Amino acid sequence: VPPSQRLLRAAEELFGERSYWRTTVADICARAGIATGSFYAHFDSKAEIFGAVVRQINEDLRKAIRAALETAGSGQRARERASFRAFFTLLSQRPWIDRIVREAEFVAPAVFREYYEHLTRGYARGVRQAQLDREVDARYDPEVIAYMYTGIGNFIGMRWADWTAGGQVPDDVVDDVLEVLRRGLPPLGPPARHVSS
């Protein structure tokens, strides 16, 4: 594994465990098994490697979603399920990544914004295609829907994967998310299957 990748992996783990502010370059180098002086051959600062970690998380997530979509089958609902499941699976494997991205809002605001712009751009393209295929109501702005998907995914993932230190988001939770996306929140309807307290 190249030294830069070892540093990125170590930095991701430490930023997730301790936060940006409580992690030092020396900590990252010790975890990576690399001399502290060698760090600066790859990154100029702790801030730079933090931005690189957030970008790597974004790339890993988009790659996981693309792979899931290749086997998702046809139809918007199948693609939505595959996308959510890919995110939740990555989050269960690396539950700290959501904390790192949230911290980026304050540590590296431009990187934080870039993260969500890249992520939602892909979702919006998928929604627009679903609108053209008449699977999603074309009256709604694809960007709005993309940010809704992202917000839902973030908070569901935080609750079931991050807060449980790597737990899986249950299938019935994913089913509920997809049903709400499909039907909205109508004022009347059949009784809910369950109510969480």
List the predicted regions and their residue ranges:
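Generic hydrophobic, amphipathic alpha-helix propensity
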Residues: 1-11, 28, 49, 53-65, ...
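Conserved hydrophobic residue
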Residues: 20, 136-137
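Hydrophobic alpha-helical connector segments
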Residues: 52, 63-94, 142-149, 171-174
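Helix-turn-helix
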Residues: 6, 14-48, 52
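Amphipathic alpha-helical packing segments from all-alpha helical-bundle domains
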Residues: 59-62, 90, 108-135, 143-147, ...
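C-terminal effector-binding regulatory domain of bacterial HTH transcription factors
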Residues: 185-197
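Amphipathic alpha-helical segments used for helix-helix packing
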Residues: 86-110, 155-162
